[in-house]
Amino acid sequence: MKIAAFVSLLMVMKKLEIQRRAENHRRKRILPLSGMQTPDAVKTVLSQPRRLEELLDMLGDKELSIRSRAAAALARLAESHPESLLKAMPRLREHIHDDSDYVRWHLIYAFGEIGACVSSSTREFLSDVFVGMEDSSRVVRMIAGKAAARLAAKRPDDIAAFFREVQRPVPPELAKYLPEGPEGNAN
């Protein structure tokens, strides 16, 4: 009887050791987001929200390919789950002047997506998009214009107020969304 109990205890201990090793092995195999393609990185962040911080950290990497991958994943995340990036806006804003056009246009695109889907005012997002509208890159300006149009379609009053505030005329492509029309917004 004592031998059977001892053997049984050994078997339980062995099973626990195997489970512990398997768990440690699984933890060690976490693939960094920087090594993933955009769709996989987005799926990972959605299933493990605390990894968003890792994605945001990638924006500050010295390697352009890593920053680009992060920006593309954040733009895709903004399309499907914009609310998940609301708290990350200050971190995203830190990188709006990145050296890479690719990174900048993805971030501007993300600002437009997030701003168009929030229930509060879009004015804070407009200032970010406005930075893109004055960018040296034609592609960034084009993406910023589309993002601003998306915001204008959602909240035309915010657009009018923003351009009054910055004392600039409303661009014609945005004026068509405003209640008083292009002629009333020439400033």
How would you label these PLM feature ranges?
Residues 75, 112, 149-150, 183:
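Structural signature of alpha-helical solenoid repeat scaffolds
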Residues 35, 64-65, 101-102, 136-139, ...:
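Alpha-helix N-cap/helix-start positions at coil->helix boundaries
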Residues 16, 46-58, 82-95, 119-132, ...:
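Amphipathic alpha-helical scaffolding segments comprising HEAT/armadillo-like alpha-solenoid repeats
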Residues 10-57:
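N-terminal "cap/leader" segments of large eukaryotic alpha-helical scaffolds
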Residues 48-76:
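A positional/architectural concept
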Residues 24, 35-39, 53, 68-71, ...:
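Alpha-solenoid HEAT/ARM repeat scaffold
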Residues 14-18, 163-187:
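Eukaryotic acidic, Ser/Thr-rich intrinsically disordered low-complexity regions
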